[in-house]
C-alpha cells in the first residue's frame, strides 16, 4: 500500500512460440497445459491474467512469491516496458484489466497495437 510506482515487463503466453517460462524450464508441460486451459494470455510479475485482464486461478498462484494481484492493481503508476509483436495481445488484455498506466514499447510493437486498435 506504500508502493506508488511499479516498473515491470510483461509476459506473453503463447506456449508453443514465445513463453520464456516454458522454454526456460521454469514451468513443466502439465503446468503450461493448465495455464492454456485457464485462458492465460499474459503475466505481470508472474501473476497470470486472461484476455480481460482478470487474474487466472491456477495451481501456481499460491506457489508464487510475488506481489498479490489486488495489491498490484492498487499501485497508482504501473509502468510496463515491452518489445516484440508477440506481446501485443497480452498488452491489450492488461490494458483492459487496468494493469498498465504507462506503456513503453518498440516501434514494431507500437504499430501492432495500433493495427489491433483499428480492428476493434
Label for each model-derived stretch:
Residues 1-120:
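Conserved phosphate- and dinucleotide-binding cores of soluble alpha/beta proteins
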